[in-house]
């Protein structure tokens, strides 16, 4: 009888561990964090005084010890990221839409599949073009808080 109860108890403990919440909100070493657009979306003006309205998605902004920034931004028609000097390497990747990027005074079109690396000391800005939102991913090294 005792062995049967012990087996049932161990089975219940194992089953309960399967239904514990995953490490979504409090990452542990070797853990992970899952975030979705709907959870992090914020309507914001165009960054760096770029004008217009954008939707910013700052993924993993509260992740302790994370040394990089990973964002998505949807630039609505007429909006942009203002021309500014870059302080660290920054990568832009166009998911959808069209835009015009200006780096160090030279302008060029960006379309889906375009990746741009801006280096420290360069200056750049980005304007949405056309009727569709310009959706981009942005990745750069986190500055110490």
Predicted regions and their residues:
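Histidine-centered metal-chelating micro-motifs
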Residues: 80-81, 100, 116, 120-126
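A short, N-terminal "cap"/entry segment at the start of jelly-roll beta-barrel domains
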Residues: 18-67
């Amino acid at each position: 009888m005792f062995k049967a109860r012990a087996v049932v108890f161990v089975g219940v403990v194992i089953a309960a561990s399967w239904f514990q919440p995953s490490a979504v909100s409090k990452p542990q070493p070797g853990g992970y964090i899952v975030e979705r657009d709907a959870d992090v979306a914020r309507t914001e003006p165009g960054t760096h005084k770029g004008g217009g309205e954008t939707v910013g998605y700052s993924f993993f902004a509260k992740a302790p010890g994370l040394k990089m920034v990973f964002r998505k931004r949807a630039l609505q028609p007429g909006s942009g990221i203002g021309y500014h000097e870059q302080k660290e390497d920054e990568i832009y990747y166009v998911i959808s839409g069209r835009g015009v990027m200006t780096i160090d005074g030279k302008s060029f079109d960006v379309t889906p599949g375009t990746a741009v690396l801006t280096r420290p000391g360069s200056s750049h800005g980005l304007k949405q073009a056309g009727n569709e939102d310009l959706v981009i991913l942005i990745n750069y090294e986190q500055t110490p808080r």
